[in-house]
């Protein structure tokens, strides 16, 4: 049976941990707001480029970009986005589970897999699963990621696609729905399919390209793919901070519950000890 001193020390220890979890909750809340701002700022840019690409894809260009052409799938590549730090609930585990299920589906079709990984958690995980799948990785991008940190990793996979070593490219990350909800999501990046509706087709008009449609399309498609990956990174960052904030709040609340239970136990121990001492005093006086 625990002594009164041990229970008191345990309560104090939990109190100290609770202070840390509350501090981490507040830090995560602040970082989440910053990540949300980044996410909202980058969205219009990505959507605007996508509209232009959809419009161009409906045009009658002599030049047909490799990113717009479908082909037989023999190898699939993924940009995998995870966090560098833990204490974020099941955020990374959910992404890994979804990706492993998708990889299993492709393996049944004898399709090879290549991964470009962002975040140390995914790097560690897939190094244990199969290091041969990893072709590129980056970690330590911080709380305010920059496009320049991702260019090399994005370019590696695009080069493999252009060389025919990868036939389809996907992006997997945690999509930020709201503070309480983040869901793992896989989206196809290449080949690019038009999202235009019938109205766009019937009311189609074409651009005049200067100096050349090939130069424009090459640049535009690369910028679009880079912005898609960046958007995934900032959404995953917002999801990470949100999940960490919720996890730390849950830890603080659980700590409070444990402290209440320990206080009840502590009071019972004290009551038992006082009762025992009184009984000893009474029995001692009766002997006298």
From Swiss-Prot:
MF annotations from Gene Ontology: ATP binding; proton-transporting ATP synthase activity, rotational mechanism
TM regions (residue ranges): none
Source domain of life: Bacteria
An individual GO BP term: proton motive force-driven plasma membrane ATP synthesis
Keyword presence, Protein transport: no
Cellular localization per UniProt: Cell inner membrane
Example of a GO cellular component annotation carried by this entry: plasma membrane
Mode of membrane association: Peripheral membrane protein
InterPro entries reported in the protein's UniProt record: ATP_synth_F1_ATPase_gsu (IPR035968), ATP_synth_F1_gsu (IPR000131)
Sorted UniProt keywords: ATP synthesis, Cell inner membrane, Cell membrane, CF(1), Hydrogen ion transport, Ion transport, Membrane, Transport
Function of the molecule: Produces ATP from ADP in the presence of a proton gradient across the membrane. The gamma chain is believed to be important in regulating ATPase activity and the flow of protons through the CF(0) complex.
Subunit structure: F-type ATPases have 2 components, CF(1) - the catalytic core - and CF(0) - the membrane proton channel. CF(1) has five subunits: alpha(3), beta(3), gamma(1), delta(1), epsilon(1). CF(0) has three main subunits: a, b and c.
Record family assignment: Belongs to the ATPase gamma chain family.
Protein name (database record): ATP synthase gamma chain
Gene: atpG
